[in-house]
C-alpha cells in the first residue's frame, strides 16, 4: 500500500523540462507530468512583442498563452482559432489597448478557465461574451467600463464558482436581469469605481465582496439583502462615508470578516448597527473616528475574535478566569462579567527595549459609552 501511494504521488509530480521550438520572439516552456513524462502541457509567452504577433501559431498542447503588452487594439474569434487554441486553459491579454470584444471572441476556447483582460480600454461587454468557456477567473480591472449587467458572467451550464475583478473602472451602475440564470459569482471586486450606493446583488452566491474606494456616503438597512452566504465584506476608504444605518448588516448571518478601515468620518458603531453579525470573527476599524464601543459588543458579536481600532490597536477576546493582573502593553475593555477584550497598544519604543524594560506609564483605558 505504501509503495502504491508513493507511485501515485510520483505520477502527479510535475517535471519541468527545457524550452522547445517556438514562434520567433515567443518563449515556450514545457511542463511534463507523470513518472515517465507521459503527459505534457506548454506555456507560451508572447508578451511585449508587438501587435503584429496575432494570430500567432502555438504548439498543439498549449495550456497557457500570454499576449500581454502587445499594443493590441482588437481581438476577435479568428485570432484565437487554430491548432493549440482548443486546449487553452489560461489566456492573458492584459496591458493592451483593446477597446472592444464581441459575443463570439472567446467562443472556441472551450476549456478556458482563466482570462485576464485588465489594463485595457473596454467600455462595454456584449451579452454572452463569456458563456462558452468554463471560466473560474475573469480580470477586467483597470478598464473604462461605465455600467455592467452581471448576466454577462452567467454560464450556459451550471457554471463553476467564479472570481470577477471589476476594480478601478468607471462603474456607476450594476444591473442584473432576474429572468436570466444567476451567475455563479463567489468573489466580486468592485473597488475603485463610482458607485454611490450598494448595488443590488440579491441572489448571487457571493462569499467575498469588495466595495473599497467608492463614493458611498452611507450604508442602509437592506443594502445587503439576499447575500446570506457572504463571509467577507470590505468597505474601506469610502469617499465621504459618514453613516451606518441601524441593522445595516442584519441580512449577513454568515459574515466572518468586516473591514470598515480608513473611513475617518465614521464616528460611532452602535449596538443597532452591529446587530445580526452573529458569525463575525474579525472587525477592522483602524483609521476611523470610532474610539469607543458599546459595552454589550460581545453580546451582539458572540463569535468575535479580534477588533482593530484607531492606528492598528488590536483587541482580542479572552475569557476571565478568577484573578488576573494588568499586562504591560494591554488595555482592558470591560465588556461583560466573563468575556473581555484585551487591546495591545503600540509600543512607544523599539520592540527590543520594551522587552528589556517595562513601560513607565500605564496604558490608558479606551472609553466605553
Curated annotation (Swiss-Prot):
InterPro entries: Leu-rich_rpt (IPR001611), Leu-rich_rpt_typical-subtyp (IPR003591), LRR_dom_sf (IPR032675)
Mod. after translation: N-glycosylated.
Tissue: During embryonic development, expressed in the middle primitive streak and Hensen's node. Expressed in the peripheral region of the developing eye. Expressed in the presomitic mesoderm during somitogenesis in a NOTCH-dependent manner.
SUPFAM superfamilies in UniProt: L domain-like (SSF52058)
Single GO cellular component term: extracellular space
Signal sequence, start to end: 1-19
Domain (LRRNT): residue spans on this chain: 20-60
Protein location: Secreted
Pfam families, per database record: LRR_1, LRR_8
GO molecular function: BMP binding
Residue positions the entry lists as glycosylated: 76, 189, 284
Key word Transmembrane helix present: no
LRR repeat extents: 61-81, 87-108, 111-132, 134-155, 161-181, 184-205, 206-226, 229-248, 254-276, 279-300, 303-323
Listed GO biological process terms: bone growth; energy homeostasis; growth plate cartilage chondrocyte development; primitive streak formation
Keywords recorded for this protein, A-Z: Developmental protein, Glycoprotein, Leucine-rich repeat, Repeat, Secreted, Signal
Note: This factor is named 'Tsukushi' because its expression pattern in chick embryos is similar to the shape of the Japanese horsetail plant, tsukushi.
Function text: Contributes to various developmental events through its interactions with multiple signaling pathways. Dorsalizing factor involved in the induction of Hensen's node by inhibiting bone morphogenetic proteins during gastrulation and by enhancing DVR1/VG1 activity. Wnt signaling inhibitor which competes with WNT2B for binding to Wnt receptor FZD4 and represses WNT2B-dependent development of the peripheral eye.
Oligomer and partners: Forms a ternary complex with chordin/CHRD and BMP4.
Protein name: Tsukushi
